[in-house]
Swiss-Prot record:
Residues 1-54 form the ClpX-type ZB domain. This is ATP-dependent Clp protease ATP-binding subunit ClpX. Belongs to the ClpX chaperone family. Zn(2+) binds at C13, C16, C35, C38. ATP-dependent specificity component of the Clp protease. It directs the protease to specific substrates. Can perform chaperone functions in the absence of ClpP.
């Protein structure tokens, strides 16, 4: 029961001793009373303790080698990118820990947000997810193509922050130490190097809007998402310690690199540098190339760490299918084991799955759908066939020319 009187008897707060006449409201419980002032004080104490806990959780930041070891357990290949990410993430959270305890005269450490460049299915999103999971920090994913600048139909950039707050169970202090991955960042590049006289709703304007939250600001976020409205209650979140990782395929950027290095698409330059393939050109990318592609200089400047990922080949995809701790083959073997059935993939079948993924240009993200297509009928029938003890997936089964081989007791 809440109120200021109980049977016309004056009541007092059990914590501070103030009477009902000295405070706005007293809440009555089971033989105990608490005033609105003590409730507010309790909330403040809890908030401070939660903030201290969040900071304490980040004081022991895994070292770059430890982060790399975690990535190696789940991510195949991309060794150079994994090293760059491990160092950048370590430095970021050391900076967060340092900033919280620094004196005014100490060096001001800048954020090291990350730009990942690599083809579809090369593992950009999965790398970011794995890092966040290993650090036990909130993680949110956003698609840059869904964003528009304020005043236009679409999603405000502040809604990215809402996703992170939701991932932190609305614990703002914890969200302020989280990681946000923005995918398809190349899709909001300016159309050409010259600024258009028409309004670029999902291009440079979105880059400018993202720039503010990436570099660090106190943003007002609508708790239910959507557009902001007058008199709407907002969640205030400081983005200065949020790590932003942005990624995109940047199709065609290798041609920009070739031109900068002096190697023409047609003919040969006398001073050209010869590099074997496009994958190697990706490792040569500098900020000048990214700017020429269409990202504005201010935006590039807030992404000092650039990690280039390579196109995955057949061998890489086969390793992804079989080697990581959560490899897809292991997952499907576990699924069938619950029905008492052993699952085996022929080597040729794994090669066929990898080849299909490359042909579809889906990379690693397309592997699961190919296995699902191959095993749909098997997973439907096996639970009802108690005499089946083993399923063998062949190359012909992957190619749709025959059914998987069944062995019975």
């Amino acid at each position: 029961m809440a109120g200021s009187r109980t049977n016309d008897i004056k009541v007092y707060c059990s914590f501070c001793g103030k009477s009902q006449d000295d405070v706005k409201k007293i809440i009555a419980g089971n033989n105990v009373f608490i005033c609105n002032e003590c409730v507010a004080l309790s909330q403040e104490i809890i908030k401070e303790e939660l903030a201290e806990k969040v900071l304490a959780d980040l004081t022991e930041v895994p070292k770059p080698k430890e982060l790399l070891d975690v990535l190696n357990q789940y991510v195949v290949g991309q060794d150079r990118a994994k090293r760059a990410l491990s160092v950048a993430v370590y430095n970021h959270y050391k900076r967060v820990s340092f900033t919280e305890s620094r004196d005014d005269d100490d060096v001001d450490l800048q954020k090291s947000n990350i730009l990942m460049i690599g083809p579809t299915g090369s593992g950009k999103t999965f790398l970011a997810q794995t890092l966040a999971k290993s650090l036990n920090v909130p993680f949110a994913i956003a698609d840059a193509t869904s964003l528009t600048e304020a005043g236009y139909v679409g999603e405000d950039v502040e809604n990215i922050l809402l996703k992170l707050i939701q991932a932190a169970d609305y614990n703002v202090e914890r969200a302020e130490r989280g990681i946000i991955y923005v995918d398809e960042i190349d899709k909001i590049a300016k159309k050409g190097e010259n600024v258009s006289i028409t309004r670029d709703v999902s291009g440079e304007g979105v880059q400018q809007a993202l720039l503010k939250i990436i570099e660090g600001t106190v943003a007002s976020v609508p708790p239910q998402g959507g557009r902001k409205h007058p008199n709407q209650e907002m969640i205030q979140i400081d983005t200065k310690n949020i790590l932003f990782i942005v990624g995109g395929a940047f199709d065609g950027i290798e041609e920009i690199v070739k031109q900068r290095l002096g190697e023409k698409v047609i003919g040969f330059g006398q001073n050209s540098r010869k590099i074997d393939d496009n994958a190697s050109y990706m490792q040569e990318i500098i900020s000048e190339d990214i700017q020429k592609f269409g990202l504005i200089p201010e935006f590039i400047g807030r992404l000092p760490v650039v990690a280039a990922l390579e196109q995955l080949n057949t061998s890489d995809l086969i390793r992804i299918l079989t080697e990581p701790r959560n490899a897809l083959v292991k997952q499907y073997q576990a699924l069938l084991s619950y029905d008492g059935v052993e699952l085996e993939f022929d080597k040729a079948a794994l090669e066929a799955i990898a080849t299909k993924a490359i042909e579809r240009k889906t990379g690693a993200r397309g592997l699961r759908s190919i296995i699902e297509e191959t095993m749909l009928d098997i997973m439907f029938e096996i639970p009802s066939q108690e005499d089946v003890t083993k399923v063998r997936i062949t190359k012909a089964a992957v190619e749709g020319k025959s059914k998987p081989v069944l062995e019975t007791a």
